[in-house]
Amino acid sequence: MHNHKVSGKQIVSYASFCLGNLGHSAFYGVMSTYFIIFITSGMFSGLNQSVADKLIGLITGLMVLVRIIELVIDPILGNVVDNTKTRWGKFKPWILIGTVVSAALLLILFTGIFGLAQQNWILFAILFVLIYIAFDVFYSLSDVSYWGMVPALSEDSHERGIYTSLGAFSGIIGWNSLPIIVVPLVTGVTYAVTGKHEEGAPGWFAFAAVISALAIICALIVCFGTKEKHNIIRDSAKQKTTLRQVFGAIFHNDQILWPSLAYLLYSLAAVITNGVLFYMYKFVIGKPNDFWVVGIIATIIGCCINPSFPVLNKYIPRKWLFIAGQTCMVLAYVLFIFGHNNVFLMDLGLVLFNINFALLVTVLTLTDAIEYGQLKIGQRNEAVVLAVRPMIDKFAGAVSNALVGYVAIAAGMTGSATAADMTSKGINTFNMMALYIPLALAVLSIVVFSLKVTLSEKKHAQVIEELKSKLAQGEIEKKTSVDTGTKEVTIYAPADGELMQMSSVVDEDGKPFPGKGFAIEPSSGQIYAPFDGTIKFTFGTKHAFEIVSQNGLQVVVHVGLGTVNLRGEGFETFYDDGQTVKKGDKLLEFDRDLALNNGYKDTIVIFYTQPGRIQNSGTIQAGKDIKHGEKVVDVQFK
């Protein structure tokens, strides 16, 4: 592996992208969690309570409907971004436009559409739907563009990982900073404007204005601090994903279905709880000024959990990490229910609630399910599979808004109500909907993951090996084209090293490597394209990829023997699946020393995935030293 030297421009790009999600994530927190709190507490102040409750129910229902519709229109918005062509690229315009417009619309919503609810609630409801739909569309355009921008910033998988990690890190800070500032800011501004110590409408507007301004500033930083690398090949490789494809993938692949269900149960519990914690501190505990503790604890734990996961996963299977995290969540609910009057127990509950690996485990399990599906049903659905988790998050967010609105009305936590106004019936209603239901969901997620998710790290390695054998023997990819006579492709060495006959290749367990092809005992860790062609797919472990020549020869370049167990560690790719490459283009680097030190071999095997089509595979000059780009063999096939 080469030593990554980071230039000044690269540091600016990293920092700019990182800061972008600081404001973006905080803005999402306002729209997904705190807007519903404003609706239930400040938007309809001054109206008759029964009328206000009806409007809260109506608006909440409309929000949920819009959020669910968003699941359908998201792919359309993705196409809008993909088809955008400007001198600034396709992503930056929508990051800025989406953020500015959604911020302006959010501010209008935080005014109660300029107090229209008190004048004409029917017109208010109509305008609310139109404004909220526009707001949601423009926010989604910004969101799709921000995360979709990563492949445009670098073709290096290592650098992409840095961008993603930095964005996730700043997102934790942006999201969790909201509980720290919301009460002081809202109550402070309200007192300055009205002289009342409460969370009033002026304070909520100021809160929304501050976060909206932050989001716009951060969007500008992304636009000016990063540079999109236009790549026609990358554009052509982009896959479009529909809601129908997502559900099709879920129901045809059980190891997508069950992890998704377990994650849905977790996500519902988590977003419901995050949505009601403010109500808990204000109405149940009676200490809204202590709500800042929620953000402090979540930030500290969140910044520790993500970096610790790879280390823990080296020694603890991810299934047990999922169960451990969910067990912590269950214990947190027990403390919330029975210990909410004790400061120490509440803080301990918040710590346990934030110790969770469900997101990371689910992402990795779904990624592994791509190869599982290829083996089971003969199809790879990368884009579809990776779209499952974000759609679950959006669905869970919609359900959370509905439940939070219902809880606030049913428990009497709307308008100007305070902790002193709470009845035992209201508290019991709150506990049932806000704590007992999420507790049951957390327990069910443990049951589903424990009993139904079988795709462990070890099982995935077995799937890869079986898939490799079937590919080499031509059992996975069948010939679909009509014969047009014999074709020929010249294969050039993808690496420096010594040529080997396929019959001489023995894996780390002493078993012969199946199929037709040849191998190279490498002298370096760089892998190059063996001919002009298109990258068809890459295993999630990055140790093997298939490349198809312009006239249809399908070849897998398999890097190392036993290296599947490294699970991508020590591998860096410099292409996108679906990308067209030229002979000699650098495609991959791998750490030979890491493979050898772990007891694996660094042998590079090149084999044909449709061996039945091969008519003449030429003669391999075994033992010959060869440089990448030098001719190895002419292959004739039908």
UniProtKB/Swiss-Prot annotation:
Record keywords, A-Z: Cell membrane, Kinase, Membrane, Phosphoprotein, Sugar transport, Symport, Transferase, Transmembrane, Transmembrane helix, Transport
GO molecular function list: kinase activity; symporter activity
Annotated region (Permease), positions in chain: 1-470
Up-regulation conditions: By lactose.
Record-annotated PTS EIIA type-1 domain positions: 503-610
Biological process according to GO: phosphoenolpyruvate-dependent sugar phosphotransferase system; sodium ion transport
A Pfam family assignment: MFS_2
Membrane spanning stretches: 27-47, 56-76, 94-114, 121-141, 166-186, 204-224, 261-281, 291-311, 320-340, 343-363, 395-415, 429-449
Residues that bear Phosphohistidine: 558
Domain of life: Bacteria
Name of the top EC class for this enzyme: transferase
InterPro entries with a match to the protein in the record: Dup_hybrid_motif (IPR011055), MFS_2 (IPR039672), MFS_trans_sf (IPR036259), Na/Gal_symport (IPR001927), Na/Gal_symport_CS (IPR018043), PTS_EIIA_1_perm (IPR001127)
Enzyme Commission number(s) of this protein: 2.7.1.-
Subcellular localization, as worded in the UniProt entry: Cell membrane
Any GO CC annotation of this UniProt entry: plasma membrane
Topology in membrane: Multi-pass membrane protein
Function: Responsible for transport of beta-galactosides into the cell, with the concomitant uptake of protons (symport system), and also for transport of homologous and heterologous exchange of beta-galactosides.
NCBIfam families: gph (TIGR00792), PTBA (TIGR00830)
Stated family: In the N-terminal section; belongs to the sodium:galactoside symporter (TC 2.A.2) family.
Record comment regarding domains: The PTS EIIA type-1 domain may serve a regulatory function, through its phosphorylation activity.
Record's protein name: Lactose permease
Upper lineage: Bacteria, Bacillati, Bacillota, Bacilli, Lactobacillales
